[in-house]
């Protein structure tokens, strides 16, 4: 890459970053937090944060990258996607009407709410315990990270249930919403994340998500300022780098340490070069249509229920890794949100996907506002827990693609909804057995004596 080509890419990168960052800043000033702000920051991080890191790798370490024209296409496709997304998100689909009282879809009481978070926590802890009994601490047993996807590891499907510990702790926080509950959420979820990191053998997702939710709650409540958020972001990058070194068993120093930091940070937070790599191989893609979305559900179907289930799930990430790149190392390479759309339908699917994503984020914000207006604090805690719990699915949406997001959000909705139903059923059984008693508030001693 020549300096002239780099200068052109730099101008496009600066304009695109300024465009998205400005819109995000105005939205932040208006509402402080909503899921549009979160998605915008995540999109900016995924598709634009990596450009400076790539530039240093190219000019400092002479690392090979995609041709400049392909990198330009990646930057422009990301900027255009966001433009279509933002217009869709801001477009009002119907006239604003004065809120009319309507019968709620469901309601919650104190016992049902506590039963819900206990059930969610139980799902996570039981899954971790079973996985541990089968595999032990994989971090100290396996020699490479790719081995966690091999036949040596049993009960891999259980990992999908680990995450429900975070929504459980979110319910606990939203019932109190004070600084002590906020700090308890951080300590409990990060401790659980470190435990799963050691048991699974290097999966950092639970730690990243817990820390991100903690920061956003702090921003909403005014407990964290922007400079504190920036400092926490730097700390998070360093922490994820250290965990990555441990995961891959790397021992580096000097220039090698700097090089490793750059490429691991880029791959962890901003895999934008994967999109460029996909566009570079555009002519090798046999567009898959909506099949990757359907195929991604296969992993949730046990083999005893479907004996003929394909052992290889050809979602967009696996198609990109195996069919386009001919890479069979055992690890799937994330195509990113835009890349998954390209795999499904080429360039035409990029604006269509942006419209779909705009509607998805609009729905989550509607649900979040519903929780903010809800007078029943128990129901509000459940709604907020569901919304913030879905942050992991939004990270999957931007990093992995639309197909992975759809299957995971449906799975999350089913498990969360089933936990609610079980909690309500248990409450009904306990109430029928006469085990539920209304809380009575005792009068102060002085008032009691006065009444006597």
From Swiss-Prot:
Localization per Swiss-Prot or TrEMBL: Cell inner membrane
UniProt main location, coarse: membrane
Name of a matching Pfam family: WzyE
Any one Gene Ontology cellular component term annotated for this protein: plasma membrane
Organism superkingdom: Bacteria
Transmembrane parts of this sequence: 6-26, 37-57, 63-83, 118-138, 155-175, 181-201, 207-227, 228-248, 341-361, 378-398, 410-430
Example GO BP: enterobacterial common antigen biosynthetic process
Membrane topology: Multi-pass membrane protein
Pathway the protein acts in: Bacterial outer membrane biogenesis; enterobacterial common antigen biosynthesis
Assigned protein family: Belongs to the WzyE family.
Function in brief: Probably involved in the polymerization of enterobacterial common antigen (ECA) trisaccharide repeat units.
Record text on subunit structure and interactions: Probably part of a complex composed of WzxE, WzyE and WzzE.
Protein's name according to its UniProt entry: Probable ECA polymerase
Protein's organism: Salmonella gallinarum (strain 287/91 / NCTC 13346)
Lineage of source species: Bacteria, Pseudomonadati, Pseudomonadota, Gammaproteobacteria, Enterobacterales
Gene that produces this protein: wzyE
């Amino acid at each position: 890459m020549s300096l002239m080509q780099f200068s052109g890419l730099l101008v496009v990168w600066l304009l695109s970053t300024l465009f998205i960052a400005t819109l995000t800043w105005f939205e932040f000033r208006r509402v402080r937090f909503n899921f549009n702000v979160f998605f915008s920051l995540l999109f900016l991080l995924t598709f634009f944060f990596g450009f400076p890191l790539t530039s240093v790798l190219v000019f400092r370490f002479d690392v090979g990258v995609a041709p400049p024209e392909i990198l330009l296409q990646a930057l422009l496709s990301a900027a255009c996607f966001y433009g279509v997304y933002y217009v869709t998100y801001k477009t009002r689909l119907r006239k604003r009407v004065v809120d009319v009282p309507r019968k709620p879809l469901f309601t919650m009481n104190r016992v049902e709410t506590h039963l819900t978070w206990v059930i969610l926590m139980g799902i996570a802890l039981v899954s971790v315990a079973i996985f541990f009994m089968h595999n032990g601490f994989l971090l100290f047993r396996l020699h490479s990270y790719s081995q966690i996807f091999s036949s040596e590891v049993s009960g891999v499907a259980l990992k999908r249930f680990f995450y429900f510990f975070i929504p459980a702790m979110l319910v606990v926080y939203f019932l109190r919403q004070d600084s002590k509950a906020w700090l308890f959420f951080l300590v409990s979820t990060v401790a659980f994340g470190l435990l799963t990191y050691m048991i699974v053998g290097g999966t950092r997702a639970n730690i990243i998500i817990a820390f991100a939710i903690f920061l956003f709650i702090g921003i909403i409540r005014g407990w964290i300022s922007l400079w504190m958020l920036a400092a926490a972001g730097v700390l998070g990058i360093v922490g994820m780098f250290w965990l990555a070194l441990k995961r891959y068993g790397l021992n580096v120093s000097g220039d090698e340490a700097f090089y490793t930091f750059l490429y691991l940070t880029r791959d962890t937070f901003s895999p934008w070069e994967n999109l460029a790599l996909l566009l570079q191989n555009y002519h090798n893609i046999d567009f898959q249509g909506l099949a990757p979305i359907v195929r991604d559900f296969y992993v949730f179907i046990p083999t005893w229920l479907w004996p003929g289930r394909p052992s290889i799930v050809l979602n967009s990430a696996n198609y990109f890794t195996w069919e386009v790149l001919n890479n069979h190392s055992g690890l799937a390479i994330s195509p990113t949100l835009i890349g998954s759309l390209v795999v499904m339908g080429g360039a035409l699917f990029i604006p269509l996907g942006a419209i779909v994503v705009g509607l998805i984020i609009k729905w989550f914000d509607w649900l979040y506002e519903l929780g903010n207006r809800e007078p029943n604090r128990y129901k509000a805690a459940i709604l907020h827990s569901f919304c913030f719990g879905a942050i992991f699915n939004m990270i999957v949406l931007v990093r992995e693609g639309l197909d992975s997001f759809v299957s995971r959000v449906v799975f999350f909705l089913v498990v969360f909804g089933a936990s609610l139903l079980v909690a309500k059923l248990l409450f009904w059984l306990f109430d029928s057995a006469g085990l539920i008693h209304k809380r009575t508030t005792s009068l102060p001693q002085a008032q009691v004596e006065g009444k006597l």
